[in-house]
Amino acid sequence: MIRLQYILRIFRYKLLSRKFFFYVFFVGFSFWLFLNPLKQISNITGYGISPWGYPLLLSNVFFAVLFLGSAVYVFSDIPDGGKESMFHYIRLGRIKWGIVQLITIVFLALIITLLSFLVSVVTLLPNIEGEKNWGRIYYTIALTDASSQYELLFLSPYKILSHYKAIEALLMTMGMVFLVLTFLGVAMFSISIFFSNSIAIIFGEIFAISPLVVDNISQKTPIVQFFSPASWIGISNIGYEYNWDCPTITTVRSSILLFRQVSF
């Protein structure tokens, strides 16, 4: 049996590392960069901002690249090649050691998902309002030229506003972020084991920028969205009933689970 105390020790080590602190700083800055102009609109219009901007922001291809690139940075040292890690490898054996690494990846993916949403809310303080729906600000951005007028770095896709309730979109996005990050971490771990850590990082970087590439190609060839897991963290890239240009949520979940099994 793998002792829970050992797993928690490894997980605590990852969370308290300088690498993770740098990640938190970078993610916080990225959210501030993209969301801060909303506060300017809020101050001018007098409208509060609902706390559901996370799904809209993750559907922005440029933010998605930054978000996934920072996750690659976090996963780049799994497995850790240090002396302590090698000691645990010898002590636990290959199978148990591998299981511990996979559990760590899942925990990190969950923490990153929850932390990123929390940061997106904190960034908007004190302009947050307790609105259970999307609120006026996001509809204003979607239906007017406010995004260009106030130099916003992301749009408010009307496709999302019209097809999803705010909390539904949030839960769906967080679920997809968790699944995609877990797949990314497991894939990088597997590549580093069978090939090298350098190749795993290269794979991660290609994975991180793939939403930008797919966004350009999909205008003429929509089918490429079916083969880009990284693009699925933005629910504007996931189809709904009678929309066959994008993979459905069922297709997405099944594909990620299949990819993850193959990676493992």
Regions inferred by a protein language model and the residue ranges of each:
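Membrane-helix interface segments
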Residues: 20, 93-95, 196-202
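Central hydrophobic cores of alpha-helical transmembrane segments
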Residues: 25-29, 198-212, 228
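Transmembrane helix boundary and interhelical loop/hinge segments in multi-pass membrane proteins
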Residues: 72-90
